[in-house]
Amino acid sequence: MTILNHTLGFPRVGLRRELKKAQESYWAGNSTREELLAVGRELRARHWDQQKQAGIDLLPVGDFAWYDHVLTTSLLLGNVPARHQNKDGSVDIDTLFRIGRGRAPTGEPAAAAEMTKWFNTNYHYMVPEFVKGQQFKLTWTQLLEEVDEALALGHNVKPVLLGPVTWLWLGKVKGEQFDRLSLLNDILPVYQQVLAELEKRGIEWVQIDEPALVLELPQAWLDAYKPAYDALQGQVKLLLTTYFEGVTPNLDTITALPVQGLHVDLVHGKDGVAELHKRLPSDWLLSAGLINGRNVWRADLTEKYAQIKDIVGKRDLWVASSCSLLHSPIDLSVETRLDAEVKSWFAFALQKCHELALLRDALNSGDTAALAEWSAPIQARRHSTRVHNPAVEKRLAAITAQDSQRANVYEVRAEAQRARFKLPAWPTTTIGSFPQTTEIRTLRLDFKKGNLDANNYRTGIAEHIKQAIVEQERLGLDVLVHGEAERNDMVEYFGEHLDGFVFTQNGWVQSYGSRCVKPPIVIGDVSRPAPITVEWAKYAQSLTDKPVKGMLTGPVTILCWSFPREDVSRETIAKQIALALRDEVADLEAAGIGIIQIDEPALREGLPLRRSDWDAYLQWGVEAFRINAAVAKDDTQIHTHMCYCEFNDIMDSIAALDADVITIETSRSDMELLESFEEFDYPNEIGPGVYDIHSPNVPSVEWIEALLKKAAKRIPAERLWVNPDCGLKTRGWPETRAALANMVQAAQNLRRG
């Protein structure tokens, strides 16, 4: 029984973000569709070759996506919302882009599909939309074309397909409500057709992703798996693929399915290898997800070997990444600025492929010398002074309950804040960032490269902040922001100013569409050596009589959007960050900043996948936020911002944050998120986002007014704020001015009644 290795997927964007650049060039009309398609072909060929050269046996095909793999699956099935359809009924790449971003070089603009987090990761998918009576057919053959490409290049191909039950689980019913699970029998013939086409091409194994099987699914959904896979059996071998958690609670459902193999995430799940071996059918292949696809740390291969060695020779076995390497940067070798000690602790996607090759070879030969050599830096890290800071650990141990309590309750604070700020009804504000123009990015880049001295850099940033204040005053906004011209990314910026973080030059990972982020890496105990945001906030406030918000990224979001340490708990990291940012709140307040926003867009996405594990996470997540904020005086107004959230199931925790104002993303969901706040009788102030900043479309005054009136039916108008869904960093100034002017006009109309 020779052991093989494989990856569940590979990063799509390219080492230099070639896909992002090609997408944005095409969207802007600066390149042709053929040029865009050529970039995709080149990236796929390169990535297959890189994996092969790194020692991967079975190459994933179908993991590439022009925007998002869930959206690719929707198009495969012919699931195109009516508003995005071509007049002749055809589907092309512009159809895909209209669904993802609301517009494309061809076709009429229309509201983009809803976007939300992919399980508990920082990747976003486009939510499939279902309507009663809709029909499905094989429409978008990207998977088959890419399989043909890979076969023509001589590769050993393992197609990747999002499974039917998970795809339905991820979607939402629009219009007249019905059970979306009732669509399962309608989509299975398309899956059968795809599998038949793959069989014709000589494919032996298909990786069919059903990550919903790690969730606490309703019984009806669990029961749907058997008839679904009965319908799909017999054409090619199916590797049922799960990730992000273990499968033990649903193993009885899984073992009844007519598949030939199971992939299990042995990094994030608690499944024991011996128990899996005992309970899986003896003729099934086990794909062991031993290498963490979601982090950047070098694996302790001696430990991984010990974890799996007892079943070697007892069943067919593959070793694999825990999940797709989509969530990891591509190549550590191009990082020239990391110091050698720290660099030796990491492994990016290509290095993880090498780890899989080392592990496969050791399991096949029994020779573990190479594993011990690879794992040596991990032992050294455990004792490094770069990791441990006794002062931070002492401060963390001394936290008391009082450290997470504001001095008075919201009602008392609100009175003090009303007296201080005297804001009108329907107060208008933005979420924080303004367009990151070419001039701003060039300014930062020149400074970073040493082509610009500190004085000229600061003069340039000050000018952009001044422009942002002037623009906001001209528009008539009530609470202003400084625009964040000095910030490259809301998490990276703070990480750069906190001890305990390191950064990469090219450690890009895809967030959604063409949006890429370069997450900081937490390597040690976190502390704040000096104030971070105070200088620019104070300068912005000096330019206006209106209040200017101080802008912080909250501790849970910094944790969730960074690559965390693996040697301490996430709770420990979050509370260390909270203590560092608590000092920042105190310094902002002392500098005269009266409104401080602590963004926590990632609070919900950090939830464990199983509801039974939620309480512990929410307890420390809320406590971290409160430690961060509780130092503020009564007349300092604390805002928080959250996006891509469904709130129903965590309303107790949202209220427990005790923020004076919460702003949320609601426009894509047509204000339906406010239902949670209404039913809960949320006591504090709320700013429901009135337009979608992810789309370049400008909302009309009437549209915004209608949304606000809808909001006022659920939340008393005196507690409503008016704001966009999210920061405006990715937008251009023309559409930003137009949208904000309409937003302010809508608020003024409502004030007049």
Curated annotation (Swiss-Prot):
Keywords: Amino-acid biosynthesis, Metal-binding, Methionine biosynthesis, Methyltransferase, Repeat, Transferase, Zinc. L-homocysteine binds at residues 431-433, 484, 599. It comes from the Bacteria. GO terms for molecular function: 5-methyltetrahydropteroyltriglutamate-homocysteine S-methyltransferase activity; zinc ion binding. Binds 1 zinc ion per subunit. SUPFAM superfamilies: UROD/MetE-like. Its cofactor is Zn(2+). Pathway: Amino-acid biosynthesis; L-methionine biosynthesis via de novo pathway; L-methionine from L-homocysteine (MetE route): step 1/1. The active site is at residue 694. Transmembrane segments: none annotated. It is an enzyme of class 2 (transferase). PANTHER family: 5-METHYLTETRAHYDROPTEROYLTRIGLUTAMATE--HOMOCYSTEINE METHYLTRANSFERASE (PTHR30519). Catalyzes the transfer of a methyl group from 5-methyltetrahydrofolate to homocysteine resulting in methionine formation. Belongs to the vitamin-B12 independent methionine synthase family. This is 5-methyltetrahydropteroyltriglutamate--homocysteine methyltransferase. The gene is metE.
